[in-house]
Amino acid sequence: MFKELALIGTTASGKSDLAIKIANEKNGVILSLDSLSIYKKIDIASAKPNKAELASTRHFGIDLVLPNEYFSVGEFIKEYKRAKDFASNANVPLIITGGSGFYLKAMISGLAPKIANFKSDLNNAEIFAIAEKKDPKFAAKFSQNDTYRLQKWYSIYRATNEIPSEFLAKNTSAPIIKNLKIFEISTKKEILNQKIAARTAKMIEAGILDEAKFLFENYSGAKPLGSIGLKECGELLYNTGEFEAEILKREFSRAKKTAKILNKTEILEFWEISPQNFEYFFNSKFKNSDDFELFKIAKLANLITIHTTQLAKRQRTFNRSFKDKISASNEILEVEILKFLS
């Protein structure tokens, strides 16, 4: 009997590794939920499965369009239907996994009308107070710390002049998937932060700067170039944002004052690169870099790590909206998923 499940979790939690392991054991098919992996040419920044992994397991949702081509949630739903048809015809399980909870939410809750974001001077507490008065059904489900949903609620309220929960109930399309079993990888923050830092170091060693240079030269202005990893690389390559010459000069001067001798180890420590990740900066790719060049690369790693950690926090908050899920460690989830598929 055909079965499908969703495996969710924050970025760097190990979703892809676990999904591939289970898919190989059960001869299953994987549908990637990653919003960057849909793009061709974006391999390192998306942490896309490598060639061997793609060859061992049939994947959908990967390398669908070029970076400058349009892709919508509607297109993703079509890809889901292709993946489901393939898996059900082969009578093998379909594992839906990735960090883009928005795609999954649209499929299990229905697709809501697109409403432009309304720029407001109100803070979360003020919007929440309005929601409590106008739409208590919504306010009962979310806290005033949930910036994403509060802004979405207020945008709908201003655009339609209706109670948002009632507007969405009337105008949201029917769910594409019903009764989907959802498994969530739960990782302690300290461990996840270490994984994020290690993955960032590996991305830099793998050549994310070269990948970014190619993308900015060939697809300048494309939407995915504003994503975490590529955005920071673009700033370094073109000396903008956090990598403006004057900012770097001041920071480098401060680092030299902090350390008596500014060697490579002290540069990495200045940017909080952990000792276990030093190896990625001491190999052949960077061993001939001068101190200032390494200083910039270390800052790049620091910024990507910080921004990815912030993304993980947002993903964790968003994933709370998925009800009736099983949340556990990778090891426990592996057992639970195999039990579900048996």
From Swiss-Prot:
Residues reported in the UniProt entry to bind ATP: 9-16
Catalytic activity as recorded in UniProt: adenosine(37) in tRNA + dimethylallyl diphosphate = N(6)-dimethylallyladenosine(37) in tRNA + diphosphate
Site (Interaction with substrate tRNA): 100
Names of the cofactor(s): Mg(2+)
Positions contributing to substrate binding: 11-16
Chain residue ranges for the region called Interaction with substrate tRNA: 34-37
Transferase keyword on record: yes
One Pfam match: IPPT
Keywords from the named record: ATP-binding, Magnesium, Nucleotide-binding, Transferase, tRNA processing
EC number(s) per entry: 2.5.1.75
HAMAP family, alphabetized: IPP_trans (MF_00185)
Matching PANTHER family: TRNA DIMETHYLALLYLTRANSFERASE
Function: Catalyzes the transfer of a dimethylallyl group onto the adenine at position 37 in tRNAs that read codons beginning with uridine, leading to the formation of N6-(dimethylallyl)adenosine (i(6)A).
Subunit structure as annotated in this protein's UniProt entry: Monomer.
Family the UniProt entry places it in: Belongs to the IPP transferase family.
Protein name: tRNA dimethylallyltransferase
Organism: Campylobacter hominis (strain ATCC BAA-381 / DSM 21671 / CCUG 45161 / LMG 19568 / NCTC 13146 / CH001A)
Gene: miaA
